Amino acid sequence: MSQARTLHRLIAPAVEALGFELVGCELFRRGATTILQVFVDKPGGIGLDECAKVSRQISAVLDVEDPIRGRYTLEVSSPGLERPLYTANHYRRFIGNKAKIRLREPREGQRQFRGMVVAVDNEEQVTLQLDNKILKVSLGEIEKANLIADFEG
């Protein structure tokens, strides 16, 4: 299990106890600094004060459990307009929206695709309508995915 998944399982109860959805978390390095980026949401969106409240709660859990080796920076935010997509339910929620995905392994010589999310089946297979074809991929094949903000309406 990846460290991000372990952290997700560790902090999810604290986030949910405050009435928020833990959309996902990512652990990465930016220069010499380790960053734990946590995305939270609720119906109607989440504000800065609420992010601060969640941050304090997550910090308390992480201080007790100490799952990250060394120093790190905790960033808590809304998922934003180009929100990450992690689960089948995320894709289902945004059927009809444009997304960009990066696959773990190339398919037909390509790892990155942009298209409209058109379906998610019970086997967690995501279907995207690309410009000229349909792409079906399992969640396990997807390394990273985000919505594409549509400012044209």
UniProtKB/Swiss-Prot annotation:
Principal subcellular localisation of the protein: cytoplasm
Keyword Cytoplasm belongs to the record: yes
Localisation: Cytoplasm
Protein known as: Ribosome maturation factor RimP
InterPro entries xrefs: Ribosome_maturation_RimP, RimP_C, RimP_C_sf, RimP_N, RimP_N_sf
Gene Ontology annotations of biological process type: ribosomal small subunit assembly; translation
Family membership: Belongs to the RimP family.
Organism: Coxiella burnetii (strain RSA 493 / Nine Mile phase I)
CC terms in the record's Gene Ontology section: cytosol
PANTHER family: RIBOSOME MATURATION FACTOR RIMP
Annotated CDD domains: YlxS_C
Functional summary from the UniProt entry: Required for maturation of 30S ribosomal subunits.
Keyword terms, alphabetized: Cytoplasm, Ribosome biogenesis
